[in-house]
A protein has these predicted regions:
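Acidic/polar, glycine-anchored loop/turn motif associated with catalytic or activation segments
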Residues: 426
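Amphipathic alpha-helical coiled-coil segments
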Residues: 14-17, 21, 409, 416, ...
């Protein structure tokens, strides 16, 4: 190798170490970038001349060169954020997103799970790329098989008409007995109050999600026997009749000498009453008064008497609940490990909204980086194996968490020192070769 050749060899070392330092600098700059995967330089030697000698084959090197940059796709640490739309992948795989990056409209892949619900209701990252997944039917909650952008923010929980009312009431046996066959006078509120022993108000929902007040009046007929009467303002049934009252259902309640619920009518399995509110569909409503000893036994159920009671204490409502609700807006979303998205609505309803899709690659380190912490598939990466999280070698989803960069700062500083020394040594080779050339030129003097 000539002195001139040593200059070029040294320059190749300088260039290689420059590339290496650039890679290290990029890793350090992105040590706090969510989902970032560090890289390392791949270098090789350069051969210019092969000399065949008696002892064997030897090669004269011409320095080094950077041949490629290899992405290190190891797992990063998970950071809990408390933000419900933040997602992290534990294991292999990438989030799939649809949109544009640098003018390219395609499906992109990323480990950055910083998502939000955008103005159109889509789960999207901060760059506007929409998260892909398997949307679910809002009516059935069944997750589909077609991949599409997950639009969850615009979903509305449809209303449900009241069909079951559960009551736990205590009716004071010391209330005056109004006599067998006593009825409720629905002329007005004052007559209903004077012809009953106790009353309470419940709220029911019709098929359109409209709320209606239904009053329940109780009459102490005789010892151990009460009647109940469901009353509504007729304006709830026909606006033209507002101000008038109508009894829409009635039945009886009997109690044992211990104050336990013995029987009630109408008995199951039929409804307690049928009602049709204005503009809505007709609905059957069944009252559950508790475990009636005799009534439930006839229906094949072990009756314990627990529920509505008649104890010597003030008449009062213990609990009242019903299964209807109005339409509701989405207020909160949550994710399971398999990527299933659950929505909680303002009406208390909870529904499955879909499932996050994930893609895995045979050679994920060969994906093409396009900026924004996103990648495109390449011939080297292979085609994406798309499916549900936690299946087919794909990792699990951790909600309210983010995957941190997998850059190890201590390793990067170590590599920086080694690279710096390599750069200095190559520079010294240039200086030394220059001195040798100077000496060679001075031989002529």
């Amino acid at each position: 190798m000539s002195i001139f050749s040593s200059l070029y060899v040294a320059m190749s070392g300088i260039r290689s170490n420059e590339v290496g330092m650039g890679i290290i600098g990029d890793n350090i700059a992105n040590m706090n970038t969510i989902g970032f995967k560090g890289s390392r330089g791949v270098f090789s030697d350069i051969l210019n001349t092969t000399i065949m000698g008696e002892p064997g084959l030897s090669e004269v090197g011409q320095g080094s060169m950077a041949t490629s940059v290899q992405r290190l796709v190891g797992q990063g640490a998970l950071l809990q954020t408390g933000v419900s739309t933040d997602l992290a992948i534990g294991g292999n795989g990438f989030f799939m997103m649809k949109g544009q990056v640098s003018g390219t409209d395609a499906t992109f892949y990323s480990r950055n799970g910083q998502f939000r619900i955008d103005e159109d209701g889509f789960l999207a990252n901060m760059g506007g790329l929409q998260l892909l997944g398997f949307p679910a039917s809002l009516t059935t909650g069944e997750v589909g098989t077609n991949i599409a952008p997950l639009q969850v923010g615009t979903q509305i929980s449809p209303p449900k008409a009241t069909n079951n009312v559960t009551l736990d009431v205590n009716l004071d046996p010391k209330e005056p007995q109004l006599g067998p066959g006593a009825t409720l006078d629905t002329t007005d509120e004052s007559t209903m109050a004077s012809t009953s022993s106790f009353s309470t108000t419940t709220t029911w929902y019709d098929s359109l999600g409209e709320a209606h007040d239904v009053d329940l009046y109780y009459i102490h007929q005789q010892s151990g026997e009460w009647s109940w009467h469901a009353v509504v303002d007729q304006g709830e049934l026909d606006p033209a009749l507002a101000g008038n009252f109508q009894e829409v259902g009635t039945g009886t309640l009997t109690f044992t000498s211990d104050g336990l619920l013995d029987t009630y009518t109408p008995p199951p399995p039929g409804p307690s009453l049928t009602i049709q509110f204005d503009g809505a569909s007709s609905q059957d409503v069944t009252f559950d008064w508790g475990d009636a000893i005799t009534t439930d036994a006839v229906a094949g159920i072990a009756g314990s008497g627990v529920g509505t009671s008649s104890y010597a204490t003030k008449s009062a409502v213990v609990t009242v609940s019903q299964d209807g609700f109005g339409a509701g807006d989405l207020t909160f979303i949550d994710f399971d490990r398999d990527g299933t998205i659950h929505g909680t609505f303002s009406n208390g309803d909870q529904r499955t909204l879909g499932r996050v899709a994930m893609a895995n690659f045979l050679s994920p380190d060969q994906l093409n980086a396009v900026g924004g912490n996103s990648f495109l598939e390449s011939p080297g990466s292979g085609e994406p194996a798309v499916g549900e999280p936690n299946t087919g070698g794909r990792g699990m989803i951790f909600n309210s968490s983010l995957e941190q960069s997998n850059v190890d700062l201590s390793n990067e500083f170590t590599n920086m020192i080694v690279t710096q020394r390599g750069f200095q040594a190559s520079s010294r080779t240039v200086t030394t070769a220059d001195q040798m050339l100077t000496e060679l030129i001075n031989l002529k003097r």
